[in-house]
UniProtKB/Swiss-Prot annotation:
Record-stated family: Belongs to the protein kinase superfamily. Ser/Thr protein kinase family. CDPK subfamily.
Cited PROSITE patterns: EF_HAND_1, EF_HAND_2, PROTEIN_KINASE_ATP, PROTEIN_KINASE_DOM, PROTEIN_KINASE_ST
Protein name, per record: Calcium-dependent protein kinase 7
Binding site for Ca(2+) 2: 431, 433, 435, 440
Presence of keyword Transferase: yes
Length: 542
């Protein structure tokens, strides 16, 4: 499911941009299908999918498919669709302008007539779920809205006007080692973040990284999660996906895991330093043979002038044995990256874990509000957190025990003391530390960008302020605690923690200040007087 912004095609289309003597232009189109052609045992039904026309001849209407499983607003009521930015195998990307703000975005439109199989529909759903799951990371293209009508699914996302990283490589031939180290640190940081959140990209290549600003090589955004999947630690995948130059050998052997993303990143690093891929041939079959053979050329120019440390990192990222290959967080600690001044000691993107820690310091009102917000989110927005819960809930009971949480954190690369895990258990389960239920886990791990959305904040406030007075009182909070089976002790203290003007109740501005303030500690900052408005002055929920 290719994506596109300015200055080139992104995603599934490949335009043979490497120098001719070093490259082969494999068949334009979806690289996912190209890889299937390599596999002689691939089921015939998948190689020869029925066309939309053949479906229509059988009396079926592909436009009747409900991809999102819910009704959405009309895209054109909120956005003006502009010029075409590019064309992919499954969708077309357009420039669009939000009517209310005048802000420009990219809108990827996927016609339903191209969603021929159940797997095609699931691929689109999963792509949207993963984009929501990863939203908020500064180096991942932000998803803004998703719409569906009778003809298509429309994904509105951040507009990246700087073009492709691939184009920058082509323009410069190869980067200095310092620049390459800076770029690969960002790319591998994205990979490490994805893996820590239980996502495997499966199609890493320069074309799938965009620049927000054409003058800033470091303004990188990862795009195109059409082949990405959720995974659990130790899970083995067998589906042949990816792009020939960047595919790992274990993918061709149909037995792989997230280590394959590190291989692809290693190929990107080789390209960043030399301008050509390490494995190439005059045919697609030849490329695969070269990948399986695994010989890396460090003799041709410019490699004699490149440091041994850089070559050491490439060798360790392109180790043929996945278990011996560096993990993403280990790449970030390699001496070559450290020597270039952009190293990090971060072994795991802490987004989910830090939210769990913050949750342990949160008052009951904020916890309740997060539960309300979590219940309002669509399935695709919480799908990633659901998969993480399932990975920890090994017995499929819908609850997590102390031991399961400790083991799950360890498998995701996080080390906590038993006392810290106990604090998390106690906080997330409100009043005891025996188990964490699914709903409590979702509320505790909501990303900040979900919490701070105006419509979610207003809906949560309205949940407490059922009579519409514009204030949350002790009585209202007591009723809410009862509805969620939470202990209602210390409610007056909870009110006083949030009540900034000491009138014994919480207005909308104070509620927003609590939700948007620091989650650690309860000393909320006083809001500016311009924000000190009651609910009656806040935007209305539609």
């Amino acid at each position: 499911m290719g994506n596109q912004c300015q200055n080139g095609t992104l995603g599934s289309d490949y335009h043979n941009r490497f120098p001719r003597e070093h490259a082969v232009g494999y068949v334009q189109g979806d690289s996912y299908l190209d890889l299937k052609k390599f596999d002689d045992t691939w089921p015939e039904v998948n190689n020869f999918k029925p066309t939309a026309a053949s479906i229509l001849r059988r009396g079926l209407d592909p436009t009747s498919i409900n991809v999102l499983g819910r009704k959405t607003a009309d895209l054109r009521e909120h956005y003006i669709i502009g010029r075409k930015l590019g064309q992919g195998q499954f969708g077309t990307t357009y420039l669009c302008t939000e009517i209310n703000t005048g802000c420009e975005y990219a809108c990827k439109t996927i016609p339903k007539r191209k969603l021929i199989t159940k797997e095609d529909v699931e691929d689109v759903r999963r792509e949207i779920q993963i984009m929501h799951h990863l939203s908020g990371h500064k180096n991942v293209v932000a998803i803004k809205d998703v719409y569906e009508d009778g003809q298509a699914v429309h994904i509105v996302m951040e507009l990246c006007a700087g073009g492709e990283l691939f184009d920058r490589i082509q323009e410069k031939g190869h980067y200095s080692e310092r620049k390459a180290a800076e770029l690969i640190r960002i790319i591998v940081s994205i990979v490490a973040m994805c893996h820590s959140l239980g996502v495997m990209h499966r199609d890493l290549k320069p074309e799938n990284f965009l620049l927000l600003d054409k003058d800033d090589d470091l303004s990188i955004k990862a795009i195109d999660f059409g082949l990405s999947v959720f995974f659990k630690p130790g899970q083995v995948f067998t589906e042949l996906v990816g792009s020939p130059y960047y595919v790992a050998p274990e993918v061709l052997h149909k037995r792989y895991g997230p280590e394959s993303d590190v291989w692809s990143a290693g190929v990107i690093l080789y390209v960043l330093l030399s301008g050509v891929p390490p494995f190439w041939a005059e045919t697609q079959q030849g490329i695969f043979d070269a990948v399986l053979k695994g010989h890396i050329d460090f003799q041709s120019d410019p490699w004699p002038k490149i440091s041994d440390s850089a070559k050491d990192l490439i060798r360790k990222m392109l180790s043929h044995c996945p278990s011996e290959r560096l993990k993403a967080h280990e790449v970030l600690r390699h001496p070559w990256i450290c020597e270039n001044g952009v190293a990090t000691d971060q072994a795991l993107d802490p987004s989910v874990i830090s939210r769990l820690k913050q949750f342990s310091a949160m008052n009951k009102l904020k916890k309740l509000a997060l539960r309300v917000i979590a219940e309002r989110l669509s399935e695709e927005e919480i799908a990633g957190l659901r998969e993480m819960f399932k990975a920890v809930d090994t017995k499929n009971r819908g609850v997590i025990t102390f031991g399961e949480l400790r083991e799950g954190l360890r498998r995701f690369g996080a080390e906590f003391k038993d006392t810290e895990i106990g604090d998390i258990m106690e906080a997330a389960h409100n009043d005891n530390n025996v188990t964490i239920h699914y709903e409590e886990f979702i509320a505790a791990t909501l990303p900040l960008n979900k919490i701070e959305r105006e419509e979610h904040l207003l809906a949560a406030f309205t949940y407490f302020d059922k009579d519409g007075s514009g204030y949350i009182t002790v009585d209202k909070l007591q009723r809410a605690c009862g509805e969620h089976n939470m202990e209602d002790s210390l409610l007056e203290e909870i009110i006083s923690e949030v009540d900034q003007n000491n009138d014994g109740q919480i207005d909308y501005a104070e509620f927003v200040a609590m939700m948007q303030g620091s989650n650690v500690g309860l000393g909320w900052q006083t809001m500016e007087s311009s924000l000190n408005v009651a609910l009656r002055d806040a935007p209305q929920v539609h």
